[in-house]
Amino acid sequence: MTQFFIGIMAMLMCMACEKPLMTGNQEEEETEGNLMIKVFEIEKTPFGSLTRATEEASAVCKHLNYAVYSTSGERLKQVNQTTGTSEFGTASFQLDEGKYRVVVVGHSSNGNPTMTDPTCIKFTNAQTFTDTFLYSDEMTVGEDQVELNVSLNRIVSMCRFVLTDDIPEGVKKMRFYYTGGSGAFDATTSLGCVNSKQDVKIDITNGDQKQFDLYTFLHDEEGVIHLAVSALDASGNELYAREFDVPMEQNHITWLSGAFFSGVSTTTVTGVTVNTTWEGEQHLTF
């Protein structure tokens, strides 16, 4: 099959974002090609607002991951980028003529997701879970240069946990352990693909820290996560604990707020009306 230089030009426009990896089938980015992905700016709809804003990619996410797969799902090429590097926002690949699936992921986790299989792109608890955006589609490479303009969409749901009472002395860490969502997603559907046990621990550096954002990939457009929240001392001993059943929706925030340290031990949230616009919020109290 004849080789062609492929250059992708990809303007990443998100509604609502490490260096090239060269192990296995992952290769260093080609400097020229007939398929080139270039990121100029990102159009996003912030979780907290129904208005759109356009920003540079580096203002929205810390990492961009580009992958090219065969139509059978084999990963052929991958380039990982982080902000602050000269190549951030531009990726170029050399491919044979044929059909491919192109996947671009934008996020701010502490590392790159595992992208071996496009139907199960995985983040880990150690990497943390953040606002995440996706482009995924099939395309054809022919004799002529291909410039592919892509638009990324937010695929996560967020639970914003807000404390309305003071954090007692001795609490050094908040732990959020939740099930019902997924730490991995299927790039062909944008939905969660595994039953994860997501575990997030956040250090408490001062008593003014009252808001904690938790992300997950739902298995459907709507779902419920079971959230166990605990406050730990410096030795990891549990001082306070409560549990919640939290309704979630893709691309939406669920605000969960209340007096954590002075309330009852278990709360179940029911009868919640969800804003069904593209981007919306629901406010729950406990």
Where are these regions (language model features)?
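Bacterial Sec-dependent N-terminal signal peptides
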Residues: M13-F47, N251, N275-T285
